[in-house]
């Protein structure tokens, strides 16, 4: 069993057995009912990517390509435009969070990256001094939140650090999320930011190191309990999936494309499970 599958099962079991129920929940299901959840707080996981430990479960299929395309939309295009996400990447799951008839998700994610020139600043800082301890992406922008409606960012902070080991430089990353839908989005979010970590490492010709993942509120929605029990019953596949980025070292961050990524040795358990999302 992979580390990711072990952590996934442990978290599901902990939420189901020790979690508490939300109150006054904001989200709604498509039928209009309140989307309450069972949750735990303070979830942490550590993966050593350099040793082949990737945060993706084999207990159900995970849509990696669309997840990576979302990262490109946020950090390369630096956009909040749903038209761009739909037309350029053929990714449509953000459409449910459109703000009014604006065609956007509000001043969120890519709009905040562009507003503060975040990615260019991170790349410039790492180039000037890789060992500086100030490489932080923060999407938590109160001014932007007051400017428009929109879903507040779930994965809102990423920190980067480097280590030199036996002459090689390794890039580590720490992702912080305020909230995470354990069954649906956990591995999507984790692998998105592993992809971002890999892109930055490639830009400088470094190796990927460790990925640290902290979630403040890790939850399972109350219409997903049957799926949770099914996942606990499933036996993981005998495979060890790993994500690779097939571009030369030194490839410019902004030149990397979704098709440059390849998920190897991934044979997840089927059938896929269905989930009614909370909006």
Swiss-Prot record:
Q: Name one GO cellular component term.
A: cytosol
Its localization reads: Cytoplasm
The UniProt record gives the binding positions of (6R)-5,10-methylene-5,6,7,8-tetrahydrofolate as: 181, 278
Its UniProt entry gives the catalysed reaction(s) as: dUMP + (6R)-5,10-methylene-5,6,7,8-tetrahydrofolate = 7,8-dihydrofolate + dTMP
Q: Which GO terms describe its molecular function?
A: thymidylate synthase activity
Can you tell me which residues form the catalytic site? 154 (nucleophile)
Keyword Methyltransferase in record: yes
Q: What is one process in the GO biological process aspect for this record?
A: dTMP biosynthetic process
List the keywords (alphabetical).
Answer: Cytoplasm, Methyltransferase, Nucleotide biosynthesis, Transferase
Q: What is its pathway?
A: Pyrimidine metabolism; dTTP biosynthesis
Q: How does it assemble?
A: Homodimer.
Cross-referenced NCBIfam families = PRK01827.1-1
Query: What's its job?
Result: Catalyzes the reductive methylation of 2'-deoxyuridine-5'-monophosphate (dUMP) to 2'-deoxythymidine-5'-monophosphate (dTMP) while utilizing 5,10-methylenetetrahydrofolate (mTHF) as the methyl donor and reductant in the reaction, yielding dihydrofolate (DHF) as a by-product. This enzymatic reaction provides an intracellular de novo source of dTMP, an essential precursor for DNA biosynthesis.
Q: What is this protein called?
A: Thymidylate synthase
Q: What's the source species' lineage?
A: Bacteria, Bacillati, Bacillota, Bacilli, Lactobacillales
Q: Which gene encodes it?
A: thyA
């Amino acid at each position: 069993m992979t580390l990711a599958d072990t952590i996934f099962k442990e978290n599901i079991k902990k939420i189901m057995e020790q979690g508490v129920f939300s109150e006054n929940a904001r989200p709604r299901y498509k039928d209009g009912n309140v989307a309450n959840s069972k949750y735990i707080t303070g979830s942490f996981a550590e993966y050593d990517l350099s040793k082949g430990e990737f945060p993706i479960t084999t207990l159900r299929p995970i849509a990696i390509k669309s997840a990576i395309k979302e990262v490109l939309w946020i950090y390369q295009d630096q956009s909040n435009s749903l038209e761009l996400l739909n037309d350029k990447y053929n990714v449509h799951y953000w459409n449910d969070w459109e703000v009014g008839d604006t065609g956007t998700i509000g001043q969120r994610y890519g709009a905040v990256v562009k507003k503060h020139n975040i990615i260019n600043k991170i790349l410039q800082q790492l180039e000037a001094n890789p060992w500086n301890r100030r490489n932080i992406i923060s999407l938590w922008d109160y001014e932007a939140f007051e400017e428009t409606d929109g879903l507040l960012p779930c994965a809102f902070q990423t920190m980067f650090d480097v280590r030199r080991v036996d002459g090689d430089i390794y890039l580590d990353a720490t992702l912080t999320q305020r909230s995470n839908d354990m069954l649906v989005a956990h591995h999507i979010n984790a692998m998105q930011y592993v992809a971002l970590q890999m892109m930055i490492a490639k830009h400088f010709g470094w190796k990927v190191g460790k990925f640290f993942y902290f979630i403040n509120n890790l939850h399972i929605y109350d219409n997903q309990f049957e799926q949770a029990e099914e996942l606990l019953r499933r036996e993981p596949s005998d495979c060890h999936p790993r994500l690779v980025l097939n571009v030369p070292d030194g490839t410019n961050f902004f030149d990397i494309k979704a098709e440059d990524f390849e998920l190897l040795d991934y044979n997840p358990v089927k059938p896929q499970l269905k989930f009614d999302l909370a909006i």
